[in-house]
A protein has these predicted regions:
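Non-catalytic terminal/linker segments enriched in charged/polar, low-complexity residues
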Residues: 1-140, 162, 167-168, 338-347
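P-loop/Walker A NTP-binding module and the surrounding RecA-like catalytic core of P-loop NTPases
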Residues: 80, 110-347
């Protein structure tokens, strides 16, 4: 290879690296904008009220802290988490001798970040590129009917497919009418394969066939749907135990992840659902859907603080690309992101 060929190769490599970097940056900016848009209702209910209450030049006193406490509670952050945030703010104010209320805005933001930091968030690379995992990687979705399990599976399948993974869906919700049809539509949209049987079939049999097919077809990731029947915990527990047993006949570590899907619009009811489901299944992560349709997005903070279960994915819209890997820093920045014309001072 001549000197000019070497120079040309170096230039081409540099250009490709620059283009890849720009594409990645553009994608991240787009995702942040979608996240910010999706949190509009929560931001209007929580952050804008907080900003208005703090006001310019207002002094810090117990009356102000009580007003802020009420805002946090009504934003579905939860009593225990609100108490933690307020106590942290109160202690910092006392220790640092803060007087101007403008300081509180940043203190609350930092305490929320501290709550999220207690549970490390995996990187996009690790999640979607399935780094350091045994394949097929098996993810099981649980949750009551209507929270968006089917949609979540379809969007997750799409996300994994974008990273060149071979995806297989198992339609093990054989009790709900039209569940198979809906999941089949999403499988087609994501352009992935699906294993299903007729309505009323044994869910464990569907799971068994799905794992067998996934191993035979060398699938990278398997997504399992399940029925949502929390009102009958005894039957649900038996069903999940049976599903777990048949999975382990194919792969000892399966399921590798158990994701509980929750509807953000239900607010504190979502926290209660998480508590109940944790009694019947080893939940490894939360998927919080419909954040764009509610002012109750603060529930994500309470779930993290009180249940110590990591939020792994969030739904910020109806489009197939609107299921995002949860990034606590991006979430907090988007939540507190104010219009350019609004200035919050931190003296």
């Amino acid at each position: 290879m001549g000197i000019f060929d070497k120079i040309k190769d170096k230039v081409s490599s540099a250009v490709k690296s620059t283009v890849d970097s720009v594409v990645k940056t553009t994608s991240e900016v787009f995702q942040f904008e979608r996240l910010r848009d999706g949190l509009t209702k929560t931001r209007n209910s929580f952050v804008n009220k907080l900003r208005a209450t703090i006001g310019l030049g207002r002094k810090i006193d117990e009356k102000l802290l009580e007003e802020i406490e009420e805002i946090l509670i009504t934003s579905d952050i939860g009593f225990a988490t609100t108490e933690r945030i307020i106590n942290s703010v109160r202690n910092t104010v006392k220790r640092e001798n803060y007087e101007n209320a403008d300081r509180i805005y940043e203190l609350i933001k930092q305490e929320i970040l501290a709550i999220f930091a207690e549970i490390p968030a995996p990187s996009q690379e690790d999640v979607y590129k399935l780094n350091n995992v045994e394949k097929p990687f098996v993810m099981m979705m649980i949750g009551v009917n209507g929270v968006g399990k089917t949609t979540t599976i379809g969007k997750l399948a799409h996300n994994f497919k974008k990273f060149d993974n071979k995806v297989l869906i198992g339609a093990a919700d054989t009790f709900r009418a039209a569940a198979n049809e809906q999941l089949d539509v999403w499988a087609k949209r994501a352009d992935v394969e699906i294993i299903q049987q007729k309505q009323g079939a044994d869910p464990a049999a569907v799971v068994y066939d799905t794992l067998a097919a996934g191993i035979a077809r060398k699938s990278d990731v398997i997504l399992i749907d399940t029925a949502g029947r929390l009102h009958n915990k005894a039957n649900l527990m038996k069903e999940l135990e049976k599903i777990n047993r048949v999975m382990k006949k194919h792969k000892e570590s399966a399921p590798d992840e158990v994701f509980l899907v929750l509807d953000a619009t239900t607010g504190q009811n979502a926290v209660q659902q998480a508590r109940e489901f944790s009694k019947v299944a080893p939940i490894t992560g939360i998927v919080l859907t419909k954040l764009d349709g509610t002012a109750k997005g603060g529930v994500i903070i309470g779930i993290t603080a009180e249940l110590k279960i990591p939020v792994r994915f969030i739904g910020v819209g109806e489009k197939i690309d609107d299921l995002q890997l949860f990034d606590p820093i991006a979430f907090t920045e988007a939540l507190f992101d104010l219009p350019d014309e609004v200035e919050v001072t931190n003296e």
